Amino acid sequence: MHLWYWVIGLTAFLFVLPWLPPKRRGALAGETSITFHPDRKTVHARFGETLLDAGLRQAIDLPYECRNGGCGVCKCTVLQGQVDPGLYQPSALSAAELAQGKVLLCCATALADVEIEYRAGQALATIQEYTARVARLERLAPDVMRVLLALPEGQGISFKAGQYINIILADGERRAFSFANAPHEPEFVELQIRLMPGGRFTTYVFEQMKEGDSLRFEGPIGDFTLRESSRPIVFVAGATGFAPVKSMVEDAFQRGLKREIYLYWGVRTLRDLYLPGLPEAWAREHPNFHFIPVLSEPTPADAWNGRTGLVHEAILEDFPELKEHEIYACGSVRMVEAIFPFLKKHGAEDGACFSDAFSVSARSLAFQPRQS
């Protein structure tokens, strides 16, 4: 009797299987196939595995950086089949691009067998994985922590000023942080980490991390680096966007760069200007360096006599014409996206504007209340 129940159940399952939604079929099948173009290589993805993870696991050199839906480097096109685009930052993939069949390799999962086209030749050839020890923790402000990471003896990491690393969490998720030290200071990897409300990793840094803890990371990543040019440089830093700028400025001094350098550091209040003495010292020691801090919401207690308002407004007051300058902006996605249209109206050229936008993990953002 039990055998008949089993036969009837199996027959019913086989009968309804073709009408199951692709996502359910994929879940039951356990694996889907992904064919990557232009190399026409086919790999198998486990249920719930992103296109990127499946490809990397099977030796496909795919382009990526942040691995959390924030940068857009791994953008690809779905040629055939269905995918779940997953959670990502709107700044990395627009609604129009999604409608055109674009998805992010690091977020999308296959719902059935799919064919994907990506831009070959963009894979990160030098990226490596490291295990480091937390050598020092120093609170620079109530919400900014300096973290110094030490690599095992005899091991180092070669990078360019302006690049960053991905901290690898226990579940494989990544969190991106810029090198704050210059390449000629290889003893420690310096990070400047800002506490994000509801941020899983940053909360861990501020509440649980201890000196001696181990951290896995991968790097170096990114191309937010100084270009070879004779143009004056304008750095625009928002909050901890100062970290990669610090690396780039100190590297420029080390290399004897004589170009004029202007640093506009935009924060809300005086306490957010967490290392003011450092750029002030640079200005005293290097005649070609100029430091302009800008507070958008100074408090009466700040007794602030310096520049106020929005950071791009301060730049345009000083430089009504920016055609001859290179602009390097680093900070939140909102800040970076807001300033460039204004600067370009005053002559800043597309080929001379570079940015590194800090994005909250798309997965973390999805579970946080929308800010009004």
Predicted regions and their residues:
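Short, surface-exposed secondary-structure boundary micro-motifs
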Residues: 79-82, 121, 170, 220
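Short, conserved phosphate/pyrophosphate- and ester-handling motifs at nucleotide-, phospho-/glycolipid
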Residues: 162, 241, 332
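Reductase modules of NAD(P)H-dependent flavoproteins
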Residues: 1-108, 260, 267-372
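Fe-S ferredoxin-like electron-transfer domains
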Residues: 93, 100-150
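Ferredoxin-reductase
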Residues: 126-214, 232, 267-269, 294-298
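Residue-level marker of beta-strand positions
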Residues: 50, 57, 113-115, 164, ...
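Short, Lys/Arg- and Gly-enriched loop/turn segments at beta-strand edges
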Residues: 173-180, 222-229, 365
